[in-house]
């Protein structure tokens, strides 16, 4: 780990941790309906939306009604996004004349954006019209992030309230998170990105003549304009040689902002944040990294204020930061080593800069390694380099961060409610060790609570490992693997880990835009998101109904270094026990190969 990376990491964490308390306090005020600097313009719009939808924001919901409202809203979102994709060939704002998206790809994409995953088996500039990008995908970037915040707030209310039967109102939480948090921040960030050169227009694509002919592979399309596959399910491609380069345009900055702030991750372009029209320079790169973790870090402060003890939120944030710093250092160390090919050719002594394969020269190894750590610490999935080109052990960092459940900061809302499940597990383990009934924030942790916590922690590993096994055993699953051997297994494992944990990044050597992977990954995304959310809401309902117990002398404090260490240990231990065998078959085996 060199001085460049260390300086970048320290600068990043300093800005992030200074901004988190300010935003965290604002989120608490906004969600609770208190007056903020945005109330003057936001409140009339908020009230108008309630009247239009026939919603009483003061009507409290128990956890079941809260869950039903959330599920209905998200199912309707899937239907809307699917319909817009299928019909885009007949809809306006389609200057490239792109046809409707294939049914399996449209369903996968609809589930992906509604679940805050933003897994993309397609290239945005050659698949989605401007209308689809704006009305379908960008809208879901807002409301999927707001859904995560709403579910977290319901859990925090469950911890803060006592002897209560309700958790708040889903519709009010959704609207306030969107109006007072996501929209203003996205507007500010979009303007900042435009100032750095990010594209924002509705112009047709521009064709430019290149000096040198280019040769590339493109998907073979049928008469309906859909990708064709061979007998074994592998994608069919054609070689194209041309001197014409198409420069895609579009409303990029407005989607880029919420893609990052909402930890969504789906790029307007296929190259995502490695594309110069999405992420032009080092300043925009720093802004994008800060945007990804800003709200997840701030929500820790919101949690502390809502439960009446800021130190509770600081302890959770400290555990997240310790884990994040360790993974970031690991990624940087392995990526700053020469590649095995250079070392074998005895060129390592002359090589400078480490593993530059798959990295943009304008960012370099340090910024790419940090971005990869940031995007997989959050359930974001945006990338500024090719994760598939990371070294075998360098690629373990993004992979393992996802497999730990996206709780190292994590997604907007989802990261903190996942980490709170680990916090309850940690105090449960501590209670067993000292022979006391476990308590967290004055709430006794009982059988139902631990059942829900176990479901939250074990649901995604089950989906990841079962899905990987299915893909490896199926002919259609193996047909999508570009690289044989251990790395091919890693590509499948990464895809399932990304989908089930709602991250969305990929080892892009896997050809995943096939009916097999669109269905398999779609199921992983859906159940990986909503199994956990329903379990979290059930846990919140159980905790809200409990009386608050007075602090006892022998109770374990949940604000000090001991608790932080126990929480970090619980996260790492569960991850190690669950995924070490799979990691041994993939990246570890690849690293040990001659």
From Swiss-Prot:
> Where does the record place it?
Cell inner membrane
Q: What is this protein called?
A: Potassium-transporting ATPase potassium-binding subunit
State the taxonomy lineage. Answer: Bacteria, Pseudomonadati, Pseudomonadota, Betaproteobacteria, Burkholderiales
The answer to whether UniProt assigns keyword Cell membrane to this entry is: yes
Question: Which molecular-function annotations from GO does this UniProt entry contain?
Answer: P-type potassium transmembrane transporter activity; potassium ion binding
Q: Main role?
A: Part of the high-affinity ATP-driven potassium transport (or Kdp) system, which catalyzes the hydrolysis of ATP coupled with the electrogenic transport of potassium into the cytoplasm. This subunit binds the periplasmic potassium ions and delivers the ions to the membrane domain of KdpB through an intramembrane tunnel.
Question: Which PANTHER family does the UniProt record give?
Answer: POTASSIUM-TRANSPORTING ATPASE A CHAIN, POTASSIUM-TRANSPORTING ATPASE POTASSIUM-BINDING SUBUNIT
The organism's place on the tree of life at top rank: Bacteria
Where would you say this protein principally sits, based on its record?
Answer: membrane
Provenance organism:
Bordetella pertussis (strain Tohama I / ATCC BAA-589 / NCTC 13251)
Which NCBIfam families is this protein grouped with?
A: kdpA
Family affiliation: Belongs to the KdpA family.
Q: How does it assemble?
A: The system is composed of three essential subunits: KdpA, KdpB and KdpC.
Pfam families cross-referenced by the UniProt entry: KdpA (PF03814)
Q: Which UniProt keywords apply?
A: Cell inner membrane, Cell membrane, Ion transport, Membrane, Potassium, Potassium transport, Transmembrane, Transmembrane helix, Transport
Membrane topology is: Multi-pass membrane protein
Q: Which InterPro entries match?
A: KdpA
**What are the TM regions of this chain, as residue ranges?**
3-23, 67-87, 136-156, 179-199, 287-307, 314-334, 415-435, 453-473, 519-539, 562-582
Cellular component aspect of the GO annotation: plasma membrane
């Amino acid at each position: 780990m060199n001085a460049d990376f260390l300086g970048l990491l320290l600068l990043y964490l300093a800005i992030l941790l200074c901004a988190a308390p300010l935003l965290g306090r604002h989120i608490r005020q906004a969600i609770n309906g208190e007056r903020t600097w945005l109330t003057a313009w936001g409140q009339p719009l908020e009230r108008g939306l309630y009247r239009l939808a026939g919603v009483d924001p003061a009507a409290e919901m128990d956890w079941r009604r809260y869950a039903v409202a959330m599920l209905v809203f998200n199912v309707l979102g899937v239907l809307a996004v699917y319909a817009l994709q299928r019909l885009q060939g007949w809809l306006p704002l389609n200057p490239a004349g792109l046809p409707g998206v294939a049914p399996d790809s449209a369903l996968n994409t609809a589930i992906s954006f509604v679940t805050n995953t933003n897994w993309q088996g397609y290239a945005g500039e050659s698949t989605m019209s401007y209308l689809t990008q704006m009305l379908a995908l960008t809208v879901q970037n807002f409301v999927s992030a707001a859904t995560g915040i709403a579910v977290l707030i319901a859990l925090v209310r469950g911890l803060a309230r006592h002897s209560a039967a309700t958790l708040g109102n889903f519709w009010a939480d959704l609207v306030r998170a969107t109006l007072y948090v996501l929209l203003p921040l996205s507007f500010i960030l979009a303007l900042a990105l435009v100032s750095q050169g990010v594209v924002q227009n509705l112009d047709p694509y521009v064709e430019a003549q290149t000096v040198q002919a280019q040769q590339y592979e493109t998907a073979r399309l049928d008469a309906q304009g859909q990708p064709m596959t061979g007998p074994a399910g592998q994608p069919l491609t054609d070689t194209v040689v041309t001197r014409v380069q198409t420069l895609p345009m579009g409303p990029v900055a407005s989607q880029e902002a919420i893609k990052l702030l909402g930890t969504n991750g789906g790029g307007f372009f296929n190259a995502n944040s490695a594309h110069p029209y999405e992420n032009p320079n080092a300043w925009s790169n720093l802004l994008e990294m800060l945007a990804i973790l800003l709200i997840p870090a701030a929500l820790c402060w919101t949690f502390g204020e809502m439960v009446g003890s800021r130190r509770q939120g600081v302890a959770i944030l400290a555990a997240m930061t310790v884990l994040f710093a360790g993974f970031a250092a690991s990624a940087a160390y392995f990526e700053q080593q020469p590649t095995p090919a250079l070392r074998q050719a005895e060129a390592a002594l002359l090589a400078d800069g480490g593993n530059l394969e798959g990295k943009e020269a304008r960012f370099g190894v340090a910024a790419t390694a940090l971005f990869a750590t940031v995007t997989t610490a959050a359930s974001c999935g945006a990338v500024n380099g090719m994760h598939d080109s990371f070294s075998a052990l360098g690629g373990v960092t993004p992979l393992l961060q996802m497999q730990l459940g996206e709780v190292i900061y994590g997604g907007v809302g989802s990261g903190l409610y996942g980490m709170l499940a680990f916090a309850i597990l940690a105090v449960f383990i501590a209670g067993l060790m000292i022979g006391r009934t476990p308590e967290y924030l004055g709430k006794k942790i009982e059988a139902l609570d631990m059942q829900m916590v176990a479901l939250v922690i074990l649901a995604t590993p089950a989906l990841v490992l079962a899905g990987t096994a299915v893909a490896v055993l199926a002919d259609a699953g193996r047909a999508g693997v570009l690289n044989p051997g251990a790395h091919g297994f890693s590509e499948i494992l990464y895809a399932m880990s990304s989908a089930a944990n709602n991250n969305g990044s990929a080892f892009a050597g896997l050809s995943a835009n096939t009916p097999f992977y669109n269905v398999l990954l779609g199921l992983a995304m859906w159940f990986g998101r909503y199994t956990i959310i329903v379990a979290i809401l059930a846990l919140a309902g159980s905790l809200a109904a409990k009386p608050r117990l007075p602090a006892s002398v022998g109770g374990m404090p949940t604000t000090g270094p001991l608790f932080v260490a126990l929480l970090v240990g619980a996260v790492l231990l569960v991850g190690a026990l669950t995924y070490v065998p799979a990691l041994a078959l993939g990246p570890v085996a690849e690293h040990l190969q001659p």
